[in-house]
Amino acid sequence: MPYPKKVTIKEVGPRDGLQNEPVWIATEDKITWINQLSRTGLSYIEITSFVHPKWIPALRDAIDVAKGIDREKGVTYAALVPNQRGLENALEGGINEACVFMSASETHNRKNINKSTSESLHILKQVNNDAQKANLTTRAYLSTVFGCPYEKDVPIEQVIRLSEALFEFGISELSLGDTIGAANPAQVETVLEALLARFPANQIALHFHDTRGTALANMVTALQMGITVFDGSAGGLGGCPYAPGSSGNAATEDIVYMLEQMDIKTNVKLEKLLSAAKWIEEKMGKPLPSRNLQVFKSS
């Protein structure tokens, strides 16, 4: 299959990038950074999480951030929503899309959110129904699709079963997560073959971690199979919680650079994106793993 002519990058740095970081980023700095990202040409930014502050203290200012940002025309501002209370707060903050989440691995789901996958499905169905009543779309994250830190391999049958249940709820898109950064192109092909036999490619997104340096190679395989939506985090912000010190989220600017070199449109202005990544790197007080950011700083 030929490469697509256009790809959508969904920026998750302000949520997924910051949520596990020990450094507190002030509310006004979060707002400034999101506003910078809004002016890069990105059409989608996941700005925060409405998970209880007890679990994600780094994003305890979620409502203030959501209310404080500038809203650029044509940009969807999304947030992670764990339950109906979180959805109520997200609606108060003026969020455009609710992002729900669960694991394909039973063990990881229990350790991560203290629920069975069946219990999670029940909650997410309620959240999705309430979001639709409020005229919000719902995006679902399914993590540990390509490997679990506890169970190792996750059966493809389990991934298919949970994906079918989520789509039956009426979610608009399913983002498949490589939580431990263990995926390889052959595995990506196998998983996508199974899912694309059941679901349309335009409702599947991929969220790769670059822990072992395979994120971009995995994306090329997905592109060849018709996937046109990928998650990225500016600067590569957000480490892998199961491999301390290792790279986590794929850097948005590395994805954009690769796609541009392949003549695939993203509508993202790379230099503005790099400036935003450099800005948050300075606020974090540590080097971020993005390759293109390092080149940008040295030029």
UniProtKB/Swiss-Prot annotation:
| Alphabetized UniProt keyword annotations | Lyase, Metal-binding
**What InterPro entries does this protein's entry cite?**
Aldolase_TIM (IPR013785), HMGL (IPR043594), PYR_CT (IPR000891)
Which residue positions are annotated as catalytic?
240
Note the superkingdom of the native organism: Bacteria
Q: Name one Pfam family in it.
A: HMGL-like
Gene name of this polypeptide: yngG
- Could you identify this protein by its name? Hydroxymethylglutaryl-CoA lyase YngG
Record organism: Bacillus subtilis (strain 168)
GO biological process terms, semicolon-separated? ketone body biosynthetic process; L-leucine catabolic process
